[in-house]
């Protein structure tokens, strides 16, 4: 009976050791959700302030260049917002010729894959059915990804594109002005593990 009493404890200890020894599943950004990609990699509390300061510098630089930029995830991620009308004709998935005026200045930051993981999310209003909005935004996200691929000299940029349809409006879909706000592109600059480690070493 004494031996049986300790069996659950032994099994629990064994399971803990096996779990610790098992290889951790690697994070795959291309199959992760947008929420997971914006949240990963996480920043330790003691590095959060320094990472937010570095991202704050990027936010200030891009604002000075005329972009609409917000710091999200406790200031650790920069989010650039561009109205779809500045990049695409209505219902079109090909970039306008003048779209490069908005996209090209971001290329140097997008190519800093050692510092930033770049997530591109395209949103729509609720005009048309859900399937149409999903396809439209997905095709537009891929068009932006392709633009940066060619703009970089056919180099892989590591951009992770998402077409999110009309599921995440920032304003009620009532009136032209509000619908235009909802038709938007969000470009996220997420600090990489390399940047976080660099900041940690330099503290």
PLM regions and their residue ranges:
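Periplasmic OmpA-like peptidoglycan-binding domain that tethers envelope proteins to the cell wall
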Residues: 123-203
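Periplasmic peptidoglycan-binding/anchoring modules of Gram-negative envelope and division proteins
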Residues: 51-73, 88-121, 187, 194, ...
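Short, well-ordered turn and helix-capping elements at secondary-structure junctions
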Residues: 84-86, 92, 107, 165, ...
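Second-shell loop/turn segments in exported
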Residues: 41-48, 86-96, 130-134
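Short, well-ordered coil/turn elements that cap or connect secondary structure elements
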Residues: 16, 64-66, 113, 154-156, ...
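Soluble periplasmic/extracytoplasmic beta-strand elements of cell-envelope proteins
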Residues: 68-70, 77-87, 117-121, 142-143, ...
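N-terminal targeting leaders that direct proteins to extracytoplasmic destinations
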Residues: 2-8, 16-77, 94
């Amino acid at each position: 009976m004494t031996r049986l009493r300790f069996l659950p404890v032994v099994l629990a200890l064994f399971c803990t050791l096996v779990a610790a020894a098992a290889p951790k599943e690697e994070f795959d950004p291309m199959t992760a959700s947008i929420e997971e990609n914006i949240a990963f990699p996480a920043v330790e509390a003691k590095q959060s302030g320094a990472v937010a300061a570095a991202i704050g510098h990027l936010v200030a630089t891009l604002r000075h260049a005329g972009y609409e930029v917000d710091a999200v995830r406790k200031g650790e991620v920069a989010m650039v917002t561009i109205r779809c009308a500045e990049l695409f004709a209505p219902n079109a998935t090909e970039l306008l010729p003048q779209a490069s005026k908005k996209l090209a200045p971001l290329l140097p930051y997008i190519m800093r894959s050692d510092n930033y993981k770049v997530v591109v999310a395209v949103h729509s209003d609720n005009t048309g059915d859900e399937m149409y909005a999903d396809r439209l935004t997905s095709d537009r996200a891929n068009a932006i990804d392709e633009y940066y691929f060619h703009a970089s000299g056919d180099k892989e940029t590591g951009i992770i594109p998402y077409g999110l349809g009309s599921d995440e409006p920032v304003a009620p879909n009532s009136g032209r002005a509000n619908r235009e706000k909802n038709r938007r592109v969000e470009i996220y600059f997420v600090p990489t593990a390399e940047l976080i480690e660099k900041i940690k070493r330099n503290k």
